[in-house]
Swiss-Prot record:
Tissue: Ubiquitously expressed.
Protein name: DDB1- and CUL4-associated factor 17
Species the sequence originates in: Homo sapiens (Human)
InterPro entries named in the record: DCAF17 (IPR031620)
Example of a GO biological process term: cell morphogenesis
Lipid bilayer topology: Multi-pass membrane protein
Keyword Ligase: no
Role played: May function as a substrate receptor for CUL4-DDB1 E3 ubiquitin-protein ligase complex.
Swiss-Prot/TrEMBL keywords: Deafness, Diabetes mellitus, Hypotrichosis, Intellectual disability, Membrane, Nucleus, Transmembrane, Transmembrane helix, Ubl conjugation pathway
Amino acid sequence: MGPTRKPNVCSRLSRRALGCFSRDAGVVQRTNLGILRALVCQESTKFKNVWTTHSRSPIAYERGRIYFDNYRRCVSSVASEPRKLYEMPKCSKSEKIEDALLWECPVGDILPNSSDYKSSLIALTAHNWLLRISATTGKILEKIYLAPYCKFRYLSWDTPQEVIAVKSAQNRGSAVARQAGIQQHVLLYLAVFRVLPFSLVGILEINKKIFGNVTDATLSHGILIVMYSSGLVRLYSFQTIAEQFMQQKLDLGCACRWGGTTGTVGEAPFGIPCNIKITDMPPLLFEVSSLENAFQIGGHPWHYIVTPNKKKQKGVFHICALKDNSLAKNGIQEMDCCSLESDWIYFHPDASGRIIHVGPNQVKVLKLTEIENNSSQHQISEDFVILANRENHKNENVLTVTASGRVVKKSFNLLDDDPEQETFKIVDYEDELDLLSVVAVTQIDAEGKAHLDFHCNEYGTLLKSIPLVESWDVTYSHEVYFDRDLVLHIEQKPNRVFSCYVYQMICDTGEEEETINRSC
């Protein structure tokens, strides 16, 4: 069944002016986003490269803000030219921000300070300080000293916008200790906080004496995920671990005596002691073996995706039920392609329970449904497929004339990700406009040209195609963001040169304007 006809923009605006909406929360917002989606996808709308900038340090983007110099300078991406929001004072290398997350105010919560109702940047510095910075002014609102006994390096959401996990670098031990044969049992530490107001859950150590020869660990949605070099992945409940093995409840800003030393929790030089030390193997929730520890959970009901733990199985994905490990019908997904870069698969971020499988020349959106007359088993089927625009031939014939004049014909196979054919590089989802964005690249002569396509998330129909004016080198690292009426392309070139290209939605008047090239 095809898409139904929807009201045009004028009709939507008229209904909005008259207040013709139900009383459901969010109806006006959804209507506004529907109007914006119609404007984005209409034929006369263009996306123009309004400004470009270059930097010697990494460039990051988050919700309309572009960050330079390790998050020290923030520029608005909304204006038609670079508009600086703030610039923090210069700092030493040890004080630079290494990782950051954007926190946005929850709806309906009563917060202690008026500044808490505005967005904040939660930042981790090189010298183990956790900062909460105003996203509009750059002012430091809160600061917590983590610990002197390890180097914290990574920030991630355990529960989005509610709980953060701060992960340390892996403890390799000193060269002297390794030469002396002294084994380092603690692999890494995980510090867990609830945000706004900041409160400490605890710091957990990952100890090889308990978990064995573990190679990595992380925290996601309250689950401790432990990985091994053999490909084994094990899942544990973090809440159960905290309740069972927490040595002492610690509160930020309160006095604490630990190991014969007294100090204030979260202040230098005392920091936060490691107060969750596992002394016995916690209850195991789930384990599975997968190539390169690749493991994902999603779908309705819960399913997981793994690759069988054999190198020759790379590119083969098994979709299984979490409750009993049973393979879904048609649950072995393998894309028929020959390419240098492997295809990838993941659960659709729109919470529909669907699965996106991306190869060099096609994007498959798969759906998980119950088998008729057997509600306990599920099957995988295609919802829709997006195909690259390329000529339908895999074999090329080359004619060679020998010295004697004999014509020799040789046949060879083209790779599916051959740069001279249109190849998919990035697939993302714009949740507010409900659009799939797909970056496709083709090598033309010496340079690559890319375009960003918007597809209907429900049916896969192509709604809009935006050419990117800058050349695209497939050997460089690229990120492309589509955020409402903005497209942003960040490119990392050799010798740590970063470029940022900003495109904004405009109404096509037929007049060409000069693109602004700025150094931010």
